[in-house]
């Protein structure tokens, strides 16, 4: 092929062939895989119920910590396309409820650590609205054990919502993104909005209580309390010279140096 034609034909054929393979091959396969994943997720929640919700709610905080929760977006979109709402998001949102309950317990267990308490006060409103990263990185993860007990709270909340899914009362969200209290306007289900809101609110309450109880009673060892339940504010140091030492010091300062 002449060089002048090669410059035009080769790139054109490359783009054309790769585009056709992507559109009619890879996209078709990806669509079938996404549909299968969505169907499996729906089957898992309808049959596994409380057990599936327990596992999903319990392991979601580590996914958020690593940023891997973004990989679930295709599953959410597939479920919304198939059913009109995703039943996965309300269960995963229970992890944030466990985190909020754990943070409240930390606040009470560390009354002398004003630094952590200030962080909790500033991050708690965001946590209630479903933004858990400030509480994760600022409170529970640095302490260690409260992060685990927060996962326990999320597991119980997820199990509660998953149980109702197994009983046929699906709780879903019509969009993805928010969680916590911010998810209430987006809730939808197969038994009416009132039932859906009641189940979701009950799951949040279970997550709050379970996260609080687990953290308050099992989230701190004696060594952890001894290390963190102290004031973090610097203590001003004052040097005062009193008594005979000060007097002798003053006298020696006035004496001339010997020759």
Show the residue positions of the predicted features.
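Membrane-interfacial segments
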Residues: 1, 25, 29, 33, ...
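Core mid-bundle transmembrane helix pairs that form the ion/substrate translocation pathway
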Residues: 1-67
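Hydrophobic, aromatic-rich alpha-helical transmembrane segments
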Residues: 4, 8, 12, 16, ...
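Hydrophobic core segments of alpha-helical transmembrane domains in multi-pass membrane transport
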Residues: 12-24, 57-62, 99-105, 154-162, ...
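Transmembrane alpha-helix interface/packing and boundary motifs in multi-pass membrane proteins
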Residues: 22, 57-69, 80-83, 126-129, ...
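Membrane-interface helix termini and inter-helical loops of multi-pass transporters
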Residues: 30-44, 75-78, 174-190
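Helix-loop-helix junctions within the multi-pass membrane cores of secondary transporters/permeases
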Residues: 73-155
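Transmembrane alpha-helical segments and their short flanking loops
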Residues: 134-259
């Amino acid at each position: 092929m002449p060089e002048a034609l090669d410059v035009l034909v080769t790139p054109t054929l490359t783009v054309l062939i790769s585009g056709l393979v992507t559109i009619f091959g890879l996209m078709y396969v990806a669509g079938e895989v996404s549909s299968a994943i969505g169907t499996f997720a729906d089957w898992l929640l309808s049959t596994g119920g409380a057990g599936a919700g327990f596992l999903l709610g319990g392991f979601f905080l580590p996914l958020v910590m690593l940023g891997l929760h973004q990989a679930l977006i295709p599953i959410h979109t597939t479920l919304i396309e198939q059913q009109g709402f995703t039943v996965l998001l309300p269960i995963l949102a229970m992890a944030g409820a466990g985190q909020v309950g754990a943070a409240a317990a930390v606040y009470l267990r560390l009354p002398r650590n004003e630094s952590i308490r200030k962080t909790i006060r500033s991050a708690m409103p965001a946590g209630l609205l479903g933004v858990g990263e400030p509480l994760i990185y600022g409170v529970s993860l640095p302490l260690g054990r409260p992060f685990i007990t927060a996962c326990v709270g999320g597991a119980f909340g997820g199990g509660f919502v998953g149980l109702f899914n197994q009983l046929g009362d699906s709780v879903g969200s019509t969009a993805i993104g928010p969680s916590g209290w911010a998810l209430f306007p987006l809730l939808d289900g197969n038994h009416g909005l009132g039932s859906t809101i009641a189940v979701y609110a009950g799951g949040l309450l279970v997550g709050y209580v379970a996260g609080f109880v687990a953290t308050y009673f099992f989230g701190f060892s004696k060594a952890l309390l001894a290390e963190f339940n102290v004031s973090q504010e610097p203590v001003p140091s004052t040097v005062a010279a009193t008594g005979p030492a000060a007097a002798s010091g003053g006298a020696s300062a006035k004496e001339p140096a010997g020759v």
